[in-house]
């Protein structure tokens, strides 16, 4: 399928759209979905001093990710690089009953306090939250975003599963960058965005990564679960991927497509209207692509959790499917999936005070390991005032504990040590 070519000139668009950094492995591709006559996207990449800036304008009781997002956006506006009169801020919102539901209002208040009350805040959601402030989107945007998500998923899995074993340092990163450039060219030109080409590219990507020369050793694998921002953004998880690899282990982060399918399953398809019918069709398409991606990974002996519906079924009786706020039952289900499929060490990270993660995650982990009879789940919080030393020590405890001791949460593991 061919869609309209992207114009990358900032002056072509009516507005400059600040997009919060949330998905390290996906935004290099998904960002192309935002280009249009209306918007020129700028994905926030500033890191220096963002926590301090964010806490000037956001109450410490709010989620840690919000302080990072606000800090990045205020610093970008203060930098003088952008025409403030053309800037708009994007804040994706799930619209659930958690602190994240207040992100849009909190961001507006922060901008007002920072002297940028004139800068509009747009929301991107499917729940009808603040319809007057909804970002405009069309079919080419959705189509590009879908391709960016699935290509980002498979490249993330391949990179994380290859880099710890590469004989020539940097080989996996170079190959990842090569494929990002290839897909980026197609995204910009609006060509090769068909399911047939995606099917072929999945296998070419797996083949290329499988050809990288590897060390013979087999490393232990740590599964990462938790809140969306903390799981997929290095700012949110304090560079946990880099830390785990430096400790001689391999990390596995479950693809974003599981969250997309979970969200459609729990929030969109249960209504009886035209939007729900469209969501069901889109969900069928996502399921088909996800199965194809997993087949490609398995063909080249790369680990993956089962396709969404099988993955959900395997967690039956262990998680409560009625917990649908935020990441909801998906958090516990990912931990179950990892342990059932041989990844018996799971690291759970979440913002401090995240009630969804405490109810559907931390409060559930001890019962999961008892019922499964194996595995260990270590849970820790990220926060502006939290200790990174404590965070990394918990992770080290998980990495270094003997596999024969595995069956319980971190408190039970400490007792055995």
Stretches found by the model and what they are:
Residues 1-417:
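An N-terminal assembly and electron-transfer interface module characteristic of large anaerobic redox
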